[in-house]
């Protein structure tokens, strides 16, 4: 019988399940995402305010410039009324002409008149700007934090919108495009009908219409429920909002339950037009939804994210430098280890996948880097985001033949026969168990050369050969035998069999079971590798030889097998 789980003893009774949305005819489960939503980066606002040490102007500029290079067209640049630093940064961007003509900056404000005025003042001189107003609408915040009823809460949003329009008319007459965004904060905990009522009241004031879009942003300020519940909420709002064609329905998922990415994707399926988030998921508590993950999830499905992630390491380094927080090595798409396999079975599958990709691309007459990607364990080609294949397969005690042989082939052009892969992986495994940790390509090569290419009791120095009239191959070889140079002779149907015959004359009896060879590089002076599987005194083992002459490499491989038999 399977052991039965026992009660935890934790006070789970203190918590209540989230109420589902009554939406029996929901349509989002049958939808698919076919294009990228509009993106807004809030790295400089929501991301920045959650840092242990908020960014100074120089680091903010680095993030802003990065976002522009990547292709973000909507960037929330601060909370000007909350701090002088934020205000000064907005002024810096405008006065130093740092904002491209096709980028819309956004600033956040609470719904108090003096804060709204200072916020709008910060935008004077901007060509394109959005004011983002919010107030909390959930029952808990109405009752506990602000002590207001529904009508008073709605009144805050309505009056705040009027105030934004008043100051925009006063200060932003020269702005080419003025945008307005409203967020019922804590939307996810707000009664849906009340959230709709507030948004409708805000629209009544703003009067959206042709060329006068309103952004209604519906935040999962604290992630409370499974992503499907958030999707139901978004679909319900999308269905019931009037003037929907003039509304950009935006979502702002947080990651408190660890499902912000799924929540955002389902929300887009449910009708959201726009997603707000941060690079690598920075933000309050567990962070905002990760824009990197969302974008590259689309990319992995053959959809253009409309954002350039082709140098993921530059993006990560910039974010780490500016936030002074590291990106987790396991973070999707951007972490150090996300394209790395240590497990032997994973490594073997990836190695075979690369061989199949090269073969399929060649058969189709298409360059490998343009052929359809279909690779075990790797959802995207690391090269498409600026990574190399160097770290795809790394070797430790969990690695098998696939990983070890892949590293040798990648770094040293050594293409081991399958049975030799198995034999050598056992050798590496012994070292890995003894030494622990990860093995570099250099360490694997060191073990390989010590095992197969080092000097032993016998080594070939030179040889001479001829073929008799009846086709028999005759060899005369100078060999180093236990420190002395000896000449040995033998005959056979080829150089290997003749050399084996010669070795038998000095006491080394072996039977060759398999042989393979390949060039290590191209050109007239290319070296070759030869592999010999032999039975020596009842033991089956492999020998390896490397030389600029393929016959010499073959004879060295025979000597390697003999030497390994002597050591075993």
Swiss-Prot record:
Listed EC numbers: 2.3.3.13
Reactions catalysed according to its record: 3-methyl-2-oxobutanoate + acetyl-CoA + H2O = (2S)-2-isopropylmalate + CoA + H(+)
GO CC, alphabetical: cytoplasm
Domain of life, source organism: Bacteria
Cofactor field: Mg(2+)
Protein localization: Cytoplasm
Pathway noted in the entry: Amino-acid biosynthesis; L-leucine biosynthesis; L-leucine from 3-methyl-2-oxobutanoate: step 1/4
Family designation: Belongs to the alpha-IPM synthase/homocitrate synthase family. LeuA type 2 subfamily.
Protein name: 2-isopropylmalate synthase
Source organism (scientific name): Thermobifida fusca (strain YX)
Gene name per UniProt: leuA
